[in-house]
Amino acid sequence: MSEPALNPNITTQELMAIDYHYNYTEKELLADWVKLKNVSEFKTGSQFKPGMKLCQHYFPNFWNIKSSGGTSFADCWQNYELMDKVRLWGKQGMSQLWLSWVRRAVFMAGGLPNSSFYRPHFSRQVILNTGKDEGILFDPCAGWGGRMLGTVSAGWHYIACEPNVETYNNLNNLIDFLGIRNSVTLYNIPAESFDYKSQGKVDVVLTSPPYFNLEVYTTDSNQSYHKHNTFDIWVSNWLEPLINNCVSMLRDDGLSVWNVMNFNNCHLATSVIDIHNKLNYNCKYTLGFQSPIANIRTVKNKDLTYVFAK
């Protein structure tokens, strides 16, 4: 069910009283799961997002992500001056005010990072491209469930780490709702605590790592950006060892898949590419919204999923 238009004469206080969370019925959520499981042709438009309703519904703590300055979307929604500005923007620029637009405007007005859910169909697409009916995918940074949904929808087993207790619990709630417990192994630990040597081989590693301190998910000391105080130190002491450990788990024909981009003065995509190249893994293709590999060095500031192989 699409969200209704807002009252064109809504006041700022009335706008602030609206529940900005995504809320779907059980029927809508199950239909979205079926839609994801049936996808075999993958569109590149931003409105193509099977399975996303499940992520949006089950992770309300998404709105508590803080910027490096310590402000979250939830904080902004309670800021009268900011919300009044957003309301006036909408009234001046649009004939109809929609909650979806208001959410985007709050991110912009609040100077927040453009946080997003990983599209479940991207992980499904990676798996279907392997041609394997069965396999194991490891995700060192589980996050909001998108990679889990795509993996299980394709018939593979999903193994992941998630240090944030609230996110871990929400993942388990989603697992129980869909009845996919036998297809998921989830650890409430940071990626660096995972026992890579004992795990055995996997077919694909797929993750979207923290963008250093661009998004602060929790004040928990287990978060990697609390342990390494500069981007370069974080890359050397956390990201590169993580990639090395993940690649060590791969079968000979395995794929190392990373959703990253460069941001501010932090060359995250460049670092991920360079680390893989040192391990003799090269980028074979990318996934994203109309993202050709031809100009890989000029698109690394875009949010892409890079697929590396030997």
Residue positions per predicted region:
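Class I S-adenosyl-L-methionine-dependent methyltransferase catalytic core
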Residues: 1-53, 60-76, 82-310
